[in-house]
Amino acid sequence: VCSSDLNNYMVKDLLTPDYIFEASWEVCNKVGGIYTVLSTRANTLQTAFRDKLFFIGPDVWQGKDNPLFIESDNLCAAWKEHACEKDNLSVRVGRWNIPGNPIVILVDFQSFFAEKNEIYTEMWNRFQVDSLHAYGDYDEASMFSYAAGKVVESFYRYNLTENDKAVYQAHEWMTGLGALYLQTAVPEIATIFTTHATSIGRSIAGNNKPLYDYLFAYNGDQMAGELNMQSKHSIEKQTAHYVDCFTTVSEITNNECKELLDKAADVVLMNGFEDDFVPKGSTFTGKRKRARSVMLNVANKLLGTNLGDDTLIIGTSGRYEFKNKGIDVFLESLNRLCRDKNLKRDVLAFVNVPGWVGDPREDLQARLKSKDKFDTPLEVPFITHWLHNMTHDQVLDMLKYLGMSNHPEDKVKVIFVPCYLNGRDGILNKDYYDLLLGQDLSVYPSYYEPWG
């Protein structure tokens, strides 16, 4: 073996951790894109690290059945008892119900609210994190993050030694506080902070300001004050500066980090999917056929139509950010298409965007159970689930403004599905990625797109 090969081997061995801890608000908690990022690469990580890979998430499903979490009384039983009795931590340990089934530690962080002011003071004194302007979800995320850091500290001191190489990866500003805590509490643990977007970049874009044209001119701290985002921006920025390694998910987001956080990423870690993420061959064909059948059946029962399998099915999806995700552009484009006299083919468009959802429509459920065909539409024939804010919803408001009411003569029909497609929504009852296979075209006209 030549010396260069030996050096390469030693460096690789030095940089390969023995244990990985990954913290995110979306572990066993499907909220947005980060859930997809973590869950679709967990299988590869699990294969490489086996049960030395630990995901840490918030225990927000207490008292309810969480289908994504398989609790185990045997996993880490001795440490769990120690964490409870000696470290005053409340955790549940189990497996994430995804390919690879990695170990998950869910943290009950409610007890830390009593120490909130002391925690924020500590973070200001050590890292200049400004929590004075906290509101909304900042406190909840911060207490979870701090608790997650405490959990990793407890696990490390109970199970590991200074010879074990451990890495803590914190995803998004919601887990920054825990990474900063570990920087001083357990400096032996290497800390990584990954931002999948920037809070200020998203807010600038969401407030109808030209982000990309004038990115070079924005000052992140100034914009945080203007947009009332001081605390979220502060934890994001200070974590990026103080952790051992700062990463982001794309070059375009790295540009945001340089300009708005005053810190370029040390590494750009682009997201990807497992090789088998998209089914192949007959499996793909079968799933696509079943998905189209479900979507067309729901549409026909809702609209009182008889749309056939030659219907062009298109869709968009994402978090409910009307401009950032291009929902406005999508609807306007459909409206123009609907007015095109040369359009001969039926078009069925789905807007799969979780809103303030109430219950699945009972009248639609009744029709779906029936084998009869219907030639009259239901009331409000463009939504599958009732909303709590039916009179103040941006999608419904724009459909009304555009005059898109799914008339029988319209070649373009639009259906708003305002819920998470987890297979148990009460109407479509299929997972999002299974339904996606049934679409002929997926459209994502985002204005703000960090590729995160």
Regions found by a protein language model. Give the residues of each.
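Catalytic cores of nucleotide-sugar-dependent glycosyltransferases that transfer UDP/GDP/TDP-activated
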Residues: 4-452
